[in-house]
């Protein structure tokens, strides 16, 4: 599951795991998804993708994005465009925001069964945050993504609607809360939490220390 790299760390050491808590409805998860993978590859670390219901976590903490200072929200789009330009990412602010993401998140757990989790997540992020396509909020919008990766509509729907997959997403969200995960993206290395898309220098330092 995730990246399994052999680059910098071809040593007789146990592979480091990076837990990546994400929600496709999180703008910063989009950036973190693209920025984390090269670092993981460089250090031979494995990324463990952990979907969780960010909206539920926000409600648990009584946080409402729209209630942030208007000046901050006004600057948000400009700041995101700066990030996209800096890292040469084809990011676009979607017209429809926020969206429901529970089916999309459950879909990643379905695709994990087929060894296609990371490829599916990449399609989710590109569809919504690059193509301005909010159809991923519905099952009908997810089916073409699964089909492009070779999973039949029947298999995808059957698993997505299963009690097991639904309970798995609920459990992962509860695990996130119990582990003090309060937002997305959150990366965890050896129990140490790194929150946000601007923490990769610290993540690199952590991995560098482990490689010594």
Protein language model features and the residues they cover:
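Eukaryotic N-terminal low-complexity, Ser/Thr- and Lys/Arg-rich leader segments
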Residues: 1-11
């Amino acid at each position: 599951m995730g990246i399994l790299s052999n680059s910098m760390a071809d040593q007789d050491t146990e592979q480091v795991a990076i837990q990546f808590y994400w929600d496709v409805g999180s703008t910063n998860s989009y950036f973190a998804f693209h920025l984390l993978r090269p670092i993981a590859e460089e250090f031979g670390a494995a990324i463990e993708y952990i979907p969780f219901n960010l909206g539920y976590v926000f409600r648990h903490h009584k946080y409402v994005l729209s209630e942030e200072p208007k000046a901050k929200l006004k600057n948000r789009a400009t700041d995101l465009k700066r990030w996209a330009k800096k890292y040469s990412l084809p990011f676009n602010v979607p017209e429809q925001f926020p969206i429901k993401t529970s089916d999309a998140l459950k879909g990643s757990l379905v695709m994990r069964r087929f060894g296609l989790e990371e490829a599916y997540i990449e399609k989710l992020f590109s569809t919504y945050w690059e193509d301005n396509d909010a159809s991923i909020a519905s099952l009908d919008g997810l089916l073409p993504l699964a089909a492009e990766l070779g999973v039949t509509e029947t298999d995808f729907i059957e698993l997505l609607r299963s009690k097991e997959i639904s309970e798995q997403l609920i459990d992962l969200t509860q695990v996130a809360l119990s582990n003090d995960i309060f937002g997305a993206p959150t990366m965890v290395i050896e129990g140490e939490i790194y929150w946000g898309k601007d923490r990769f220098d610290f993540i690199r330092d952590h991995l560098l220390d482990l490689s010594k």
